[in-house]
Curated annotation (Swiss-Prot):
Its EC number is 1.1.1.290. Belongs to the D-isomer specific 2-hydroxyacid dehydrogenase family. PdxB subfamily. This is Erythronate-4-phosphate dehydrogenase. It catalyses: 4-phospho-D-erythronate + NAD(+) = (R)-3-hydroxy-2-oxo-4-phosphooxybutanoate + NADH + H(+). The gene is pdxB. InterPro entries: D-iso_2-hydroxyacid_DH_PdxB (IPR050418), D-isomer_2_OHA_DH_cat_dom (IPR006139), D-isomer_DH_CS1 (IPR029752), D-isomer_DH_NAD-bd (IPR006140), Erythronate-4-P_DHase (IPR020921), Erythronate-4-P_DHase_dimer (IPR024531), NAD(P)-bd_dom_sf (IPR036291), PdxB_dimer_sf (IPR038251).
Length: 386
């Protein structure tokens, strides 16, 4: 067998532990070479020069024909992220390149981020009242449905909208109802464009198959924002362009709405004008827990082992230190929320990077790269395993 060459985003957790000859079941005479590269530096020239067998990425790297046209060796692409809007899966299928993404890897991390944001800004929502808080969830995949579990556990009412799923106890409302009847609206959708339109051609780094009958680009715009009460808090931890940033700024100016953004339309650059209007802003780290990161690596490691026809020999739980952050403890002692996750610290770190009216892309990426990973809150009633 030939040696195995892997090009990997250097920000993927525990690369050395998961991607070595022993963990990949390779014989001792075969080498596994892992070339670490910043995600935004994985380009067509690198792929042509190195000719790797395996490519491991995150959402900052777009996978398409322009990246791989001069590469003849890649047989496996793994994305250690939930989303897939950065990957042209149709092109990979045409090339017979196996693709795996880490579906659900950070669903608890992101759901806990949203709960933290809500209760940091409105601590009164810890208390049960005669009129329960209504949480509107747009997108009920892995993350949205997990957020619904936490909301239910806190006694909150749930209004959910996902046109791609069957009606259920949580998929129970129209988009208009969610926007107009909720105290909180939280977005958990992929980024998609309209079918049969040239719109995506005008968007840099767009993915050719990233289209839908229910497009989400600018789902939240000047028109849909008018459906929301000024009291309604808006949270986006999905994809930045789901919200029209210009319309959002105008809306906040008019309504003083509380808005929480972990993702931004023009990420990694953020304007000071937008940032100054937000109640909480963080640098795309909602899913950045130790468990979420390791789970993402575990999932693509398991998929690569399947591709190589070897049995996985490493579990993320072998790498995890003891976790003392317990969900039931937090519910009993809401005053410990800041100890569990101080979201304002992440907010301040981002705002401190403002120079000349903006946060530079390099500073945004640095905050993500050097982020001190949080721990997930462990729970008995809400599953936190893979």
């Amino acid at each position: 067998m030939k040696n195995l060459t892997i090009v990997a985003d250097s920000n993927i957790a525990s690369l050395d532990e998961f991607f070595n000859p022993v963990a990949l079941g390779q014989n001792t005479e075969q080498q596994v070479q892992v070339i670490r590269v910043a995600g935004r530096d994985i380009n067509a020239q690198l792929m042509a020069d190195v000719q790797p067998d395996v490519l491991l990425i995150r959402s900052v790297t777009s996978i398409n024909e322009s990246l791989l046209s001069d590469n003849n060796s890649v047989k496996f692409v793994g994305s250690a992220t939930i989303g897939t809007d950065h990957v042209d899966q149709e092109y990979l299928a045409e090339r017979n390149i196996t693709f795996a993404n880490a579906a659900g890897c950070s669903k608890h991390s992101v759901a806990q981020y949203v709960v933290t944001a809500i209760l940091t800004l409105r601590p009164q929502y810890w208390q049960q009242s005669t009129k329960p808080l209504t949480v509107g969830i747009i997108g009920l995949g892995n993350i949205g449905s997990t957020l619904a579990q936490y909301a239910n556990d806190l006694g909150w009412k749930i209004l959910g909208y996902d046109p791609l799923l069957a009606t259920s106890d949580i998929n129970n409302a129209s988009l208009e109802q969610v926007l107009s009847q909720s105290d909180i609206v939280s977005l958990h959708v992929p980024l998609t464009d309209k079918k049969d339109t040239d719109a995506q051609d005008a968007v840099s780094n767009s993915i050719s198959n990233n289209v839908s009958d229910y497009p989400t680009r600018h789902l939240i715009n000047a028109e849909t924002l008018t459906l929301m009460s000024p009291h309604t808090m808006l949270i986006n931890s999905a994809r930045g362009p789901v919200i029209d940033a210009a319309a959002l700024e105008a809306d906040i100016d008019a309504t003083e709405r509380q808005v929480v953004l972990d993702v931004f339309e023009h990420e990694p650059q953020i304007s000071e004008s937008l940032l100054s209007k937000l109640a909480i802003a963080t640098p795309h780290i909602a899913g950045y827990t130790l468990e979420g990161k390791l789970r993402g690596t575990q999932i693509i490691y398991d998929a690569l082992c399947e591709k190589l026809a070897v049995l996985p020999v490493l579990s993320m739980h072998q790498l995890l230190p003891l976790n003392t952050y317990l969900w039931f403890e937090l519910k009993e002692h809401p005053d410990r929320l800041q100890k569990f996750y101080d979201i304002k610290k992440d907010d301040a770190a981002l705002r401190n990077k403002i120079t000349n009216g903006k946060v530079k892309g390099s500073d945004f990426d640095q905050l993500r790269r050097d982020y001190h990973l949080r721990r997930e809150w462990q729970a008995q009633t809400i599953s936190v395993t893979i």
